[in-house]
Structures are given as structure tokens and as C-alpha cells.
């Protein structure tokens, strides 16, 4: 499964803290950085701009982060250590504000953090209730204990409710008799007359308990056979070639992107190494995002270089890893390819599309699920129709625009999945001769650039299906989500 980017960096940071005898700062740093990931617009833990420090220490933490006992006292110190860690190890994103300016901002906020954390008038509803729960001896992260505590609190007497909710009631008097529902740190307040009639599907999405689904039984190939196919993934081989090219260190722009000339050089290097065309487009959309998420490459001291986890990839491709480890690595890369991270520095025009992109993100997963359920090749139009029928997307004015958006998004992700060995595509190869000259020329250019024509063009007879490796990967993910996904004996 995919590793959390913030968690990966925290693991490196904890080693750094231990070496400096500052391990006590690990817990408050974890709360702060996890809070920033969950409650701010920036999900890249190495990217810090002016105002980010103030927002984290004096807005997000006081309003939303429950203090287990170390946050108010050591939060500012922990964040200072983290910023110095980024600077000393060269991990600070090139577009970040310079460290001296960030530390000055932190110094101005440090003395204000503890009073802000103690000011109950600033606490949000979830923090107010979780703090009371913590005081009653229920640990953060104890989901069963939280459910029991909230159930008891919902039935407690009015005086106790008022004591806990006093600061909130001045702003939200309707909470006096509210019924609270909780799941994984998210809290919602319902009217008492709603709780028995409200269907689970009417709860906020974050509070809905996923109901296990039962899928068809599948027959899986032997693990050793699947591992052989996984190690042949073109995406993994391209990632290894990219890391080798980046090993000396390649300059990046302020946005953390490769220079245009280097992008071309890298694509040429990968093409030669993999004996398969690899254009700048393929490199930028299918290889770099996965290689970066998997730490095969990383930005250090303003340069793209080989990453700390490159050794894992080398072992996978060289036969030095066990079949189980090869498949685990392949699956993590598969998840990264299907849900690529957005670059932290967004062009303002592209940033306007982010709400639409967020709506489109789950669609590739629905498409793969449709293929898993079908257990056979699906014609392109049928696949899109099934995906469209399941979509909750509300960003389009009509089905025609919605279909175009979905088709474009799904084509890009399925193309990445094919290069990784998860899906296969077939089409009527005799039909291109009947296409107009311009379309045929476009198809030829796409092939020369390492892109299958069907990613960009409407080709007759196009069908998509999961490979045995893709079936295994989908089954692993469905099972991990708590679904019933049996295997044929």
C-alpha cells in the first residue's frame, strides 16, 4: 500500500532527532505535521511559505489539534527543529521561503502558541470533545474507546454537557442538546430528533462506516509468476533509469521542476536505457510523480538526485528481493500511479482546476473496479458508461462534458496502469488505415513518443481488461479496505 509522504519524512526526522538527543520533540512534531497535512491546503511537508508557520502554530493547532500533553509546551520547538532538519539535509523545497525568514516568523509566534492553545474560545467542536475524552483517560487513536465515550456523553446530564461545551455554546447554542457522532477524529452534531431517522448515507462522508462489499471469487496466478511480471514493469524500469540519470544531481527550477533541456535529456536517457520510446510527456506524467512518491528520486539542495529508497527498486529489478517484497513494491507503485500527487507549487491557471481534479481522482479506481467485476475485456464505450453511471461528479453542466472529462482522466490513468503491467488494451489494428491522414500521422507520433494512440485518440474496437497482475493488485486493495474478495482454490 502507498506510504504517506508526511509519515516517510517524519521517519527520517525522528532519526535526525535521535542523533541530536532531541527525541522528545518527535511526538509534538508528528501532531503538528499531521495536522498541517489534514487541515491546510499544502500537503507537501517540505514546502513552507511566509504565513505557513503562523497558520500552523496560531490557527490550526489552537482550533483543531487536541493536545496530548506536549504540543503547547514543545510545539514551537519541535517545528523549529523540523525546519532546521529540512535545511540541514537539503530537503527544503526550492520554492520555500528562506529558513532565516521562516525562523523569524516562528520566533514571533512561539510565545503566543501556549496561550492560544489554552484559549477554549478558539477550540473547535472536535477538539473540545476530544480534550474532554482525553481527560477521562481515553487515549487518542483508541477508536473503540472514543465510540464508548461519545455514547456515554450523549446521555450525560445537562450540567456536565454544559461544563464541557460552555465555550462552544456562546457561538453554537444548538449544541446544548445535540447528538454527537464520531469516527476517526471527525465529529458531527445531529439534532436529537434526527438521530433515529437519519440514514447512514446521509451522514457526512467522513463519518460513514464503509460497508464491506462482496466481490466475485478470482483465480490468482502463483506468487512467483506474478513477481516475474511485476519485475518487468516498464514504469519501474523507467524509474530506475531516471534515478541513474539523476544520480550526479540535476538542477531544478524554483517550482522544483526539471529544466526543459534536462527534461529532454532525461527522456532520451530513459529511452536508450529501456529500449522503449519515452517522451517528455511520459516522463512528466507517468515516471517522475511515481519515482518521487516512492523516494527513488528526491530534491536535495536544490537538485534532483537519486533517492533514499532507490536500493529497494534495485533489489526488485535485479532479483535480489523475495517474490512477496517484489509484489509489495509493485503494488505501492501501482497506487502512486493511479493517484499521483499534485506538485506543491501550482500554476495559478492550473490551480483553478484543482476542485475538478479532486472530483475526478476517484474515477480511475471505479474504472479498475468495473474491470475487476467484469472479469473480461470491456469495450471502451461500455467502460466509460459504467463509470459515468457510478460517478457522483457535479462539476459538469451536462453529460457530454462529464463524459469528456472522465474519458480524458481515465485514459491517462489506464495508460499509466498499462505501462505498469496492470491492464492490457487491444483495438482493431486494421482500422487506422481507414482514418484520415492527419489522425494517422498523430497516431504515429504518439507511438514514437512512447504513448499508445488510444490514450489520445478515439480508436475503433478499443477494449481494456485487467492482467493477472492487475487482478491480484485490485484484489489486494479491495481486501485491505475490508471488502470480501475471495480467491478460487
What are these regions (language model features)?
Residues 1, 11-117:
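N-terminal core-binding DNA-recognition domain of tyrosine recombinases/integrases
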Amino acid at each position: 500500500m502507498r506510504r504517506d509522504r508526511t509519515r516517510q519524512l517524519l521517519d527520517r526526522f525522528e532519526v535526525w532527532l535521535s542523533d541530536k538527543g532531541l527525541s522528545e520533540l518527535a511526538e509534538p512534531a508528528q501532531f503538528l505535521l499531521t495536522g498541517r497535512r489534514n487541515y491546510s491546503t499544502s500537503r507537501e511537508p517540505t514546502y513552507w511559505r511566509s504565513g505557513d508557520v503562523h497558520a500552523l502554530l496560531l490557527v490550526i493547532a489552537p482550533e483543531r489539534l487536541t493536545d496530548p500533553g506536549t504540543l503547547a509546551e514543545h510545539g514551537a520547538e519541535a517545528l523549529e527543529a523540523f525546519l532546521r532538519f529540512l535545511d540541514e539535509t537539503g530537503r527544503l523545497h526550492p520554492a520555500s521561503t528562506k529558513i532565516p525568514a521562516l525562523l523569524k516568523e516562528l520566533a514571533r509566534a512561539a510565545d503566543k502558541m501556549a496561550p492560544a492553545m489554552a484559549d477554549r474560545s478558539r477550540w473547535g467542536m472536535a477538539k473540545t470533545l476530544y480534550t474532554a475524552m482525553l481527560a477521562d483517560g481515553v487515549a487518542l487513536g483508541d477508536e473503540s474507546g472514543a465510540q464508548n465515550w461519545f455514547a456515554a456523553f450523549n446521555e450525560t446530564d445537562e450540567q456536565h454537557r454544559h461544563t464541557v461545551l460552555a465555550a462552544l455554546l456562546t457561538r453554537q447554542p444548538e449544541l446544548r442538546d445535540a447528538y454527537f457522532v464520531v469516527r476517526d477524529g471527525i465529529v458531527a452534531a445531529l439534532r436529537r430528533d434526527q438521530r433515529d431517522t437519519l440514514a447512514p448515507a446521509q451522514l457526512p462522508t467522513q463519518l460513514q462506516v464503509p460497508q464491506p462489499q462482496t466481490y466475485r471469487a478470482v483465480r490468482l496466478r502463483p506468487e512467483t509468476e506474478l513477481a516475474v511480471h511485476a519485475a518487468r514493469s516498464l514504469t519501474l524500469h523507467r524509474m530506475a533509469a531516471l534515478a541513474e540519470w539523476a544520480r550526479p544531481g540535476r538542477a531544478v527550477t524554483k517550482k522544483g521542476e526539471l529544466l526543459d533541456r534536462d527534461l529532454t535529456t532525461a527522456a532520451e536517457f530513459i529511452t536508450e536505457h529501456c529500449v522503449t520510446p519515452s517522451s517528455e510527456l511520459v516522463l512528466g506524467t507517468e515516471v517522475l510523480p511515481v519515482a518521487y512518491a516512492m523516494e527513488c528520486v528526491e530534491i536535495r539542495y536544490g537538485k534532483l538526485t537519486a533517492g533514499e529508497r532507490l536500493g529497494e527498486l534495485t533489489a526488485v529489478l535485479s532479483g535480489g528481493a523475495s517474490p512477496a517484497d517484489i509484489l509489495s513494491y509493485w503494488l505501492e507503485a501501482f497506487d502512486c500511479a493511479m493517484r499521483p500527487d499534485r506538485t506543491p507549487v501550482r500554476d495559478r491557471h492550473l490551480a483553478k482546476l484543482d476542485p475538478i481534479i479532486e472530483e475526478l481522482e476517484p474515477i480511475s479506481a471505479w474504472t479498475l473496479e468495473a474491470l475487476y467485476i467484469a472479469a473480461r475485456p470491456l469495450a471502451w464505450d461500455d467502460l466509460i458508461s459504467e463509470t459515468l453511471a457510478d460517478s457522483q461528479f457535479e462539476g459538469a453542466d451536462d453529460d457530454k462534458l462529464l463524459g469528456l472529462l472522465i474519458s480524458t482522466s481515465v485514459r491517462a490513468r489506464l495508460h499509466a496502469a498499462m505501462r505498469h503491467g496492470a491492464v492490457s488494451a487491444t483495438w482493431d489494428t486494421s482500422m487506422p488505415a481507414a482514418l484520415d491522414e492527419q489522425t494517422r500521422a498523430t497516431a504515429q507520433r504518439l507511438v514514437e513518443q512512447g504513448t499508445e494512440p488510444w490514450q489520445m485518440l478515439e480508436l475503433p474496437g478499443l477494449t481494456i481488461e485487467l492482467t493477472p497482475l492487475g487482478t491480484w493488485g485490485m484484489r489486494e486493495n479491495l481486501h485491505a479496505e475490508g471488502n470480501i474478495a475471495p480467491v478460487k482454490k
